[in-house]
Amino acid sequence: MLSRVARNSSLLKQLPKLRQTTVLPVVLKNSIRFHATSSENKEIFTKLTDSKDPQRNQFFQYTWGSWLKNDKLNKKKRETVFSIEGLTLFLDTIKGFETTLSQPKHLHGSFVLGQNKDLLGEAEDKIILRSIASIHEGKHHRIYKLTLNTGRDLVLRIPYKLDSDAAIAAKIKSEVATLDFLNLKLGLKVPRVLSYGSDVYNEVGSPYILEEFIPGDLLMRKWHPLSPDSEETNKALHEVIDPIAEFQDKLLSVTFNKFGSLYFHDDVEGSLQNDLPYDGETNEDLKNRWRIGPSVERQFSKNKEKLPQNLIDELNGPWDASNPIALMESVADIELENAKNKLALINADAGANENDKDLINKQIKTFEHLKKITPLLINTKSKSIMNVEELFKPRLYIPDLDPLNVIQQGKDVNYFIDFEGSTIKPFILTGYPKFVAYEGAKIYNLEEDIPGYNELDELEKEQYAFMYYKTRNERMWEFELNKHRHDLIAVASPHIKVIKSPYLQALDLKTDNDHLYVEGSIVQLQALWEAYVANELVNSKDSKFPIEYTAEYLDQHQQDLSDHQLETVSSPFSATGGWIPQDMFNTLKDQGIIVETEDGNYKIETEKVLENPPKPEEKN
């Protein structure tokens, strides 16, 4: 059975009327994006007084890639239109704010963190926006760099319209509060936030975060995960792993009083404002600064835009620290409700595809199984799990700890960015950072673990070497965890990984068929259940597995899984959901390999690929 890693690695309200003022034109620069292959920057010129300038629209359009299916819709969701005029006027207004530490202050639909006003710099008269450059089109946001007449730079983050308005608002509020907490409470190097807006009803005209610009190089430049073993490789890998492990160690230093996500005091409903997020705060300025509210973990918003918000609000917490099982159950509940809602929508469509109905019914069955087994998965009082009580305490979890989200300044200064989806949950219910996580078969020594390794052909050696390097990198992460937090190292147990796998797989749904991996992880537990009950690892005293599978069901599941994996490894761009980097898309289209179909989608002409195989590189 292919793991996810192997599967993926094988493929690539009304607005206040704007005040009128005289401002200078702004040069809008479309800069090269991270991971892009464009050869030249393109500059777009527009006047602030002409908001209808057609040139300006190009600056907001998504250009990083194209999709084989629903390309126009996907790009429309990723347009990041905002008011340049409104932003300019708003920046000058912030200049008059007090710099005292207080709750974010409301201003024309936005919220301002006055203590960070120094990010604007000093101006004799007005704060003027000199230029805007698009520097990155990411998976969830577009990033703009703002240059002011004070010589200061800021970052404007505009989220794509991929989730409901309520979800986008909650994520922005929580991320800003999390950044504030990391900076003021833990003293960590993260961007300071100047202002944020949680909806379109502000002078920027869009949800946004306006924060400190951090210059430097991405730590990812130093990450070479498949380098052969050597003293130099070991040192290089540690230069990336160590600062991220140290950052996580500081995150784990605070134990919270609830499970959920961080918000500012005034951003949660009244019933939650009386509960302290953690105990022992001695700084009067921080005592009532943050609170714990509903979780913004991605599973409560991703692909949930058609689920009624009142239902989501019932399931996304916060939860009492004494009841981690309720947090786990909420994931099974929301996926089950989402699948049932999708089926209801399909049944209401007279022309619905029967294959779609069949797929949704299979999803429902899987999530019913998940709902049944979730409260039994882990014994929260198990004497067989070292420091089990510590493992279940509420701690802050950042889902995107990654060298791609670390900016280095000099040798030892590392700034961490991107805290969307941060949540407070038990450490035992988290996974390793994706850049070191490995779910495949472990190989600790190539020659000892692989009989006849030296006699294998080069291709087979490369495949086993890949597995070895992935194992090595994960082990290095575990060694660092053990060094910093030996009391939490039980998460490295293979048995703990198996037991919590159904829950984690449900948090990692990317395609409509990924429910198969959830079911597969439940099936895997069946053979081990009796031993886990005997050792009090699971929350059950019944050695009989709680889910009854028929041979027919298991055979069908295995066939569906094999078909899904075959499609994934054999279909170009299946792993990316049909998304293709724009330069590659243009080249393949020019070559006739990508062709447009009658319904406006695109397809790959396999025969064309065979007719035009890649040419060998010419030697100088």
Swiss-Prot record:
It is found in: Mitochondrion. The keyword Transcription does not apply. Its main location: mitochondrion. Keywords: Mitochondrion, Transit peptide. Gene3D superfamilies: Phosphorylase Kinase, domain 1. Residues 1-35 form a transit peptide. One of its GO terms (cellular component) is mitochondrion. It comes from the Eukaryota. Belongs to the AIM9 family. This is Altered inheritance of mitochondria protein 9, mitochondrial.
